[in-house]
Amino acid sequence: SVKDRIGLKMVEKAEAEGRIKPGDTLIEPTSGNTGIGMALVAAVKGYRMIITMPEKMSKEKEVVLKALGAEIIRTPTEAAWDAPESHIEVAKKMQAEIPNSHILDQYSNPANPDAHYEHTAQEILDDFDNSLKMVVAGVGTGGTITGMAKRLKEDRPGITIIGVDPFGSILGGGDEVYPYHVEGIGYDFFPDVLNNDLIDEYIKLPDPESFQMARRLIKEEGLLIGGSSGGVVWAALQKAERLNAGDKCLVILPDSVRNYLTKFVDDEWMDEQGFLETA
């Protein structure tokens, strides 16, 4: 996923600064993909990896993490971010108890947006000319969109950055927090790495449209993408209508279908949630 980049960047930065060394324990609160990215790096470099992850996140993510040698602690989905039982607070408690353990903390670590400022945005600049007028991306920690937006606005003034945020999250406006099914985007707090000043506007994302579009893209375009990717494409279709002929809109699809085979890909799951489209 897009989070593999920040997993490597955060670990290598901490190593270069002398804060961690192989044999230490890394603990990361995550919705799954950052944990997988860090577990990939931990497996290669010789770190113990502990993941704290809300219950709503897919079984597939847990299976991949275990295959990479990570230890997983599940936490209640309904727990507020600062509640003692939340994935963030459980990680902090474990760090206080385990010697030589570290939370690199994707929510506040500058290496998160830096990975996308230095690499993702550069790849975009290499691949697009000045016809790129709009970028649409989901917002979770905010690292991807913040890093990309900062660099793109430096090089292409006037580019429009659209953030996509689920209903039930506060990142894109509103103060009502409630459960939603799409994974990896949205929060009930504002992560330190998120710079909303770089985001020109938000579009709020309903669950059904997110999963229905993902299923459509799989079936019609052969794009084996995750649920939030479907949501970002749905949002882009709303916003791209205002572009002129020849203008280009880039949409960031952060992960694949692998993590969601027992969720939105499955007709029975979609039907249980009331999301299944009828012919």
Where are the language model's segments positioned?
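PLP-dependent amino-acid enzyme catalytic core
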Residues: S1-A279
